Amino acid sequence: MSRFFTTGSDSESESSLSGEELVTKPVSGNYGKQPLLLSEDEEDTKRVVRSAKDKRFEELTNLIRTIRNAMKIRDVTKCLEEFELLGKAYGKAKSIVDKEGVPRFYIRILADLEDYLNELWEDKEGKKKMNKNNAKALSTLRQKIRKYNRDFESHITNYKQNPEQSADEDAEKNEEDSEGSSDEDEDEDGVGNTTFLKKKQESSGESRKFHKKMEDDDEDSEDSEDEEWDTSSTSSDSDSEEEEGKQTVLASKFLKKAPTTEEDKKAAEKKREDKAKKKHDRKSKRLDEEEEDNEGGEWERVRGGVPLVKEKPKMFAKGTEITHAVVIKKLNEILQVRGKKGTDRATQIELLQLLVQIAAENNLGVGVIVKIKFNIIASLYDYNPNLATYMKPEMWQMCLDCINELMDTLVAHSNIFVGENILEESENLHNFDQPLRVRGCILTLVERMDEEFTKIMQNTDPHSQEYVEHLKDEAQVCAIIERVQRYLEEKGTTEEICQIYLRRILHTYYKFDYKAHQRQLTPPEGSSKSEQDQAENEGEDSAVLMERLCKYIYAKDRTDRIRTCAILCHIYHHALHSRWYQARDLMLMSHLQDNIQHADPPVQILYNRTMVQLGICAFRQGLTKDAHNALLDIQSSGRAKELLGQGLLLRSLQERNQEQEKVERRRQVPFHLHINLELLECVYLVSAMLLEIPYMAAHESDARRRMISKQFHHQLRVGERQPLLGPPESMREHVVAASKAMKMGDWKTCHSFIINEKMNGKVWDLFPEADKVRTMLVRKIQEESLRTYLFTYSSVYDSISMETLSDMFELDLPTVHSIISKMIINEELMASLDQPTQTVVMHRTEPTAQQNLALQLAEKLGSLVENNERVFDHKQGTYGGYFRDQKDGYRKNEGYMRRGGYRQQQSQTAY
């Protein structure tokens, strides 16, 4: 029991009834303590002695309240901490719970917390936004709550079957608590005593009767209030009579006494009756509302409602004269709310369209109409505040129509000048005697339109029909860009012309011109006159168009970025149409490879795409070394997909946050611009095979030979590690199998692995001139197989006939002669040509296989001797240096020197 109640003598008189100040004297033995003086405020304060059950339950409810607050702010770490404390508090209250039962509020928090954690766990986007501590706490708490709730499965199931009952009890309890607190504030007679004094007091009989009556009157109210919390107005049976007596006697000293007069009794009874009446009225009102809701029988499913006729908003008051000033004022009013929170963007667009109609009906002139249409298009672009969100199809079509209408107006009225440099104060919208001036930039609208088109293509499934439908809109986009190009060529500045030219280039550079390609294959003499006329009417080829646009940018542009993009697109277009030497020369003259690392990421992606296309072009021309060098940087990184802007790698997603991922996804090129990655890898591996296999055969005994392609060697090692080799299936397996055949000089097997139906479908048929590429590949395989054969078996032959080699590799004799001559000149093959007999005579200057092994053994033994000498010096304590390269001796005045692979004994000299 608290020391507060034990202080003082039992014989003190109850002076609180007379209103005198209460002075508590210390008992004997408590000399060090000051007497406790109660002020008047403390005298009036009610003091309540709570049972152990109330204390434990209050501790639980406080923890539950903290958990719910943490759930609202998604603080899972706080939830975990409080849940652990809640479990400990529940353990302390176990004896009370065993007697009274598990409280319903405890079951509710367990069920709600488990549902809340499951929601967070299923929300993948929300989990990504969590910090590290919250994510870790979520996993831990989810496991703990699932394990903890197993002991309360039946209670949680019953609660979930009827959760409304608990909610109604809470609402009713809160209402009664609020009313009860207001009544207690007004009650001057200490009504709360009856809830505290739970046993019969041994004081006056009149007080006991009054308490008994109050308990009977308040029985219904207390039952409803204490139903959930499992509290009652009766005391616990476990309390002893002695403790009860002490509590009641001490409480009677500090609490106000119950009313004793008849007037006080009547007032208290009246208040209780009013409270019971209010409670009854609330229940009856709720029942009436439920009956009203249930009137009319069963519910019926409504198939369709009557469509609401949406009234058009009224722009102007009735009778208002529509003038330029009134319309411009209304336009400014609409634009003032643009971008503000809560603004309905669709309604704003409708208002602007209605304003255009009003301006046209009242003949206010094209100046006002053009100004409003500029704002309509800008509002369409601002409809989606999120940068990653793309336009809806209806909004996109509306945007295209508005831009076309605006261009029709600008082209039809040549006296209208638009530009960003025109201030709103200097606009001329209605004075037709002078040229009309409108603030706005048609180039900005077209660039934004192009960006929206790219965004639509990025966010559409590339394998769906919807993507094809959206791709058809590119014709409209290109037509608008072409119209704006012609308009700006007449009225635009040099900078604007360069920008619109770049837009035109970006929609042209990646397209293969099949018509121009067919015209190149068909000579003019072989085509009919109608075909020639049709070719003339089609306009200039894409090559001529690219040449004209790019040269203008090279000469007029003042910004490095536009010129760089134009050069890269020009190189890409040359490479796509197999103009290798023009593309290579333009790349070398531009020196872009020296400073491309300083460019922004979209330009770097364009550079990577151009280099890849350049490498594929070199491969088609049979220049395997140039193709390999162009593709080396992209393929050796292992991130070709990411470097070409065609997707993000899963392993790299962990290295960036969510914002960086969104930015990089916006940089991805649409699917119709993608370069086939399997074709790219196949071209690289075949080029590496044609270079690496002859090199490996020429330097087979060289332990220090370098690798031309690490990725190709990796594929070879993967193939060698397989214990059981079946027929090749993937593209990589075909290249590895072909490489093994080429090592043996078997060009026919190599050819069958590289060129077959499966490889044709995956790779070779994707080229514009597939037959030409296959013919080139067969020729390269024959030549490199011949080189490999000579390198591998030169030690076997004393001489070999070139005719034999020609028949073996199905090459004509001049080609064989040329290949062998180059090998001899480059000192790759130690041999000579005997012209009269057409034979190759081997000189046998290269060491044989046995000699190579002996040389390797001698080299390894020499390194072993050196290592042993170092270990010996270390044991003898010679830490200062190693003297084998000096003339003095050591270890019995003898030293060892490695010179040319053998040991020489040096003469003894003084050190």
Curated annotation (Swiss-Prot):
Q: Where is the composition biased (Acidic residues)?
A: 166-190, 216-230
Arranged from A to Z, the UniProt key words for this protein are: Acetylation, Cytoplasm, Initiation factor, Phosphoprotein, Protein biosynthesis
Which InterPro entries did the record assign? EIF3C, EIF3C_N_dom, PCI_dom, WH-like_DNA-bd_sf, WH_DNA-bd_sf
Q: Which residues carry this modification: Phosphoserine?
A: 9, 11, 13, 15-16, 18, 39, 166, 178, 181-182, 907
A Pfam family for this UniProt protein? Answer: eIF-3c_N
Which segments carry the region annotation Disordered?
Answer: 1-44, 157-299, 520-540, 883-911
Q: How is it modified after translation?
A: Phosphorylated. Phosphorylation is enhanced upon serum stimulation.
Q: Name one GO molecular function term.
A: ribosome binding
Annotated positions of the Phosphothreonine modification? 522
Cite the record's Basic and acidic residues compositional bias ranges: 199-208, 259-276, 884-897
Q: Which GO terms describe its cellular component?
A: eukaryotic 43S preinitiation complex; eukaryotic 48S preinitiation complex; eukaryotic translation initiation factor 3 complex; eukaryotic translation initiation factor 3 complex, eIF3m
Do you know which PROSITE patterns this protein is assigned to? PCI
- Provide ranges: composition bias, Low complexity: 8-21
| Any one biological process term the GO annotation gives | translational initiation
**How does this chain assemble?**
Component of the eukaryotic translation initiation factor 3 (eIF-3) complex, which is composed of 13 subunits: EIF3A, EIF3B, EIF3C, EIF3D, EIF3E, EIF3F, EIF3G, EIF3H, EIF3I, EIF3J, EIF3K, EIF3L and EIF3M. The eIF-3 complex appears to include 3 stable modules: module A is composed of EIF3A, EIF3B, EIF3G and EIF3I; module B is composed of EIF3F, EIF3H, and EIF3M; and module C is composed of EIF3C, EIF3D, EIF3E, EIF3K and EIF3L. EIF3C of module C binds EIF3B of module A and EIF3H of module B, thereby linking the three modules. EIF3J is a labile subunit that binds to the eIF-3 complex via EIF3B.
Q: Would you tell me the protein name for this molecule?
A: Eukaryotic translation initiation factor 3 subunit C
To which species is this protein native? Answer: Mus musculus (Mouse)
